Design a protein with these regions (language model features):
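Surface-exposed peri-terminal alpha-helical interaction modules
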Residues: 2-285
Length: 285
């Protein structure tokens, strides 16, 4: 008798598979990932159903930022050592991770203003503005602001970690040093500047990047590095834009729980660029 698609077994047979049913002393999946701790970390402070969504979205974001910091720290070390191959791979991974951070806002956007207002008071003054990992990313990418360190004074370890990042060369600072080592003309004061201060765009740096693009065939790794940096900057701007629109959708123009102006504060960051010359030269290429 002929058989059709609905006559097939409704399950995958495991009889011929070498499944390890008895793990013995070996770690299980849950033990390796410490899922007991991870899944016990969602502790709503209200009885509202939607608070769980709010907590998980932010915890997932922090996990992705943890990975980004892991990759970015390693990429910085590689750039310092003129080892661009691994650095490019790490920066590409960061870019992919950023896309996950961006789509997280789509999940949070399923929450209505009414649903959020039902538990908002439970947050007190806590805010994403206080995220240590987010601020570290901003600093490592080059958006330095000493005022942001003060938010973490109550946690000495976090305060010192952020202070070190503030005073250390950012990814872009290290990339400019790399360009200098490769023979491109970078102003000397840019190589030894006070790294705790915000970066200021330079015509000479823009000229160096133009040289990288015009001589891509002789230094493809630098050309690819430039485009990787643009990817990161572009994705960060998309993340900020999605953040703003999600906040606007859920709370309108109310002040944020951290004391900022909410949407009006977030709007100020939309035009920030970590690597300004890489955007400026596009008009003249």
């Amino acid at each position: 008798m002929a058989t059709g698609p609905y006559d097939k077994s409704e399950r995958v047979e495991l009889a011929d598979e070498a499944v390890h049913w008895d793990l013995g002393a070996s770690l299980s999946y849950g033990e390796y990932l410490q899922l007991d701790k991870l899944l016990a970390a969602q502790r709503p402070l209200s009885s509202e159903h939607n608070e769980m969504l709010f907590i998980i979205v932010h915890q997932v974001s922090e996990l992705w930022m943890r990975l980004m910091l892991h990759e970015l720290t390693a990429a910085l070390a590689c750039v310092r050592q003129d080892d661009l191959g691994p650095a490019l791979k790490m920066l590409a991974r960061i870019s992919r991770t950023q896309t996950q951070l961006i789509t997280v806002w789509d999940v949070l956007s399923t929450m209505t203003p009414f649903e959020y207002s039902a538990f908002r008071s439970a947050l007190g003054r806590s805010s994403g503005f206080q995220s240590l990992q987010y601020r570290l990313l901003e600093f490592l990418f080059g958006n330095k602001n000493a005022d942001m360190v003060a938010v973490h004074q109550r946690d000495p370890q976090a305060y010192e970690t952020l202070k070190r990042a503030l005073e250390s060369p950012s990814l872009y600072d290290e990339v400019l040093r790399l360009l200098s080592r490769r023979g491109y003309e970078i102003p000397a004061d840019y190589l030894t500047r006070d790294f705790s201060q915000p970066y200021r765009a330079s015509k000479q740096v823009a000229g160096a990047w133009l040289g990288v693009y015009h001589n891509a065939d002789k230094g493809w790794d630098l050309y690819e590095l430039a485009e990787r940096l643009v990817d990161l900057d572009h994705n960060f701007q998309l993340w900020r834009a999605h953040h703003l629109k999600t906040v606007e959708r859920i709370i309108g123009y109310k002040a944020g729980t951290g004391g900022t102006g909410g949407v009006s504060y977030l709007a100020k960051a939309l035009e920030l660029k970590f690597f300004p010359e890489l955007w400026q030269i596009r008009t003249s290429m």
